[in-house]
Structure formats: structure tokens, C-alpha cells
Amino acid sequence: MSTLSKLFQPGRIGRMELKNRIVMAAMGTGYCHHDGYVLDEYLAFMEERAKGGTGLLMTGVTRILSEVGMRPGSMGVYDDKLIPGLRDLTDIVHRHDAKICLQLHHSGTRTSEETRAVRSEEHTSELQSH
């Protein structure tokens, strides 16, 4: 038996069955619209990895709030209008018997000044009153 043979055997994470143990780590591609919509480029990128045999694909950072800036091209899950693109992404990955995992992200204090919509000092007095 090869040293790597287990890599190609089915695996499990909790109740989720995987066709193999090959996992694509989360990475930023910049292939989503600045408003968080999934673009065709991202669908094609993820499909190629699923088609190539990856068992589990992780998305790049996916913002949970529209008003918190992210790098251009990051996906969003903050509004129901984004669901159709997310559904397309899931369907494409599942079509190749792969699974997909969403990486939720909030920039917090790491948000750049250029993209930060709400400054923390604006809420300091609110917090101190509690």
C-alpha cells in the first residue's frame, strides 16, 4: 500500500462523507463582485477544482456584513439577494461529487481605514454607558 493511498480513500468530517481526503484550503481569488455576488469566473475556478477530484473545497473569506469592507472580490452572505449565486456555486461543486465549506469572515479591527464604514470611536460612548 502506498504512503498516500489513504488520501484517495473516502473520509468523513462529522456526519459529512467525503469522496476522498483531498481538501482545498480557503484562498482569496478576487473572482467575486465588489458587492459580494458570485461571478462566473469564481464558478469556473471552483468547478475546475471539483472536476479535478478535490473532495472538499473551502471558499475564500466570505463577509457577513455589507458595510464592513473587505478586499475587492470577496464573496458575501449578508443579504438574501446573494443566495442565487451561492446556490449556483453549491450546485456546481456537488455536480462533481465534492463538498463545499464556507469560510465566514468579519474583518473587525483588521479592516483598513479605506474600507471601514463604521469607525470604532463612533460607538465608544455607547459602550461606556452600559
Label each residue range with its predicted role.
Residues 1-26, 93:
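N-terminal amphipathic alpha-helix/helix-capping segment at the start of soluble metabolic enzymes
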Residues 22-25, 57-59, 100-104:
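Hydrophobic faces of well-ordered beta-strands that scaffold small-molecule active sites
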Residues 24, 49, 53, 93, ...:
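Conserved, mostly hydrophobic/aromatic
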Residues 43-65:
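Catalytic domains of carbohydrate-active enzymes, especially glycoside hydrolases
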Residues 58-83, 104-117:
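Glycine-rich, proline-tolerant flexible connector loops at the mouths of alpha/beta enzymes
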Residues 75-101:
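Alpha-helix-loop-beta-strand connector modules within alpha/beta enzyme cores
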Residues 91-94, 99, 105-121, 125:
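Non-globular sequence segments
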Residues 126-130:
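Positively charged, low-complexity/disordered segments
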